[in-house]
Amino acid sequence: MEEGLLVRKIREGTVIDHIPAGRALNVLKILGLTGREGLTIAVVMNVPSRKLGVKDIVKVEKRFLEPSEVDKIALIAPSATINIIRDFQVASKRRVEPPAVVTGILRCPNPNCVTNSEREPVTPRFVRVSLSPLKLKCAYCEETLSEAEIVDQLVSPYG
């Protein structure tokens, strides 16, 4: 089989590579991309990968990521790489890493946690306890969040 480009190169923008298969649409949700922004967006799913077996790729022309967006992507795609493209060339490339401490992005699933009290507004805070599989622990009640729970919260409209 002849190998070639599935999607053309982009002039300026961001390529998010090495996304676990099936999570590209979650990445789009996290970035708030619906396809109505006027940006050229390419989503390639289930591409063969030596590193992951299969992977997803997201290319977004004329869009660069904020650090908070990179942190969220790292929580659902810890193996991802972010490539910044300028004039059709990779200007920078870096692997994401889930943050050691996550504040204000996720909510604690423990209804008795102080962060869920209406009387006492406390910002939820989680500490990373494991990278593979990704697990976070509430800094207040020590309830843990699995990778699946993290993904659900980040892509849920109620998250």
Swiss-Prot record:
Cofactor annotation remark: Binds 1 zinc ion per subunit.
Record GO terms (molecular function): metal ion binding
Residues that bind Zn(2+): 108, 113, 138, 141
Keyword Translocase: no
Domain of life: Archaea
Disulfide bonds: none
Listed HAMAP family: Asp_carb_tr_reg
Function of the protein: Involved in allosteric regulation of aspartate carbamoyltransferase.
Family listed: Belongs to the PyrI family.
Quaternary organization: Contains catalytic and regulatory chains.
PANTHER family, per database record: ASPARTATE CARBAMOYLTRANSFERASE REGULATORY CHAIN
Entry protein name: Aspartate carbamoyltransferase regulatory chain
The species this protein was found in: Thermofilum pendens (strain DSM 2475 / Hrk 5)
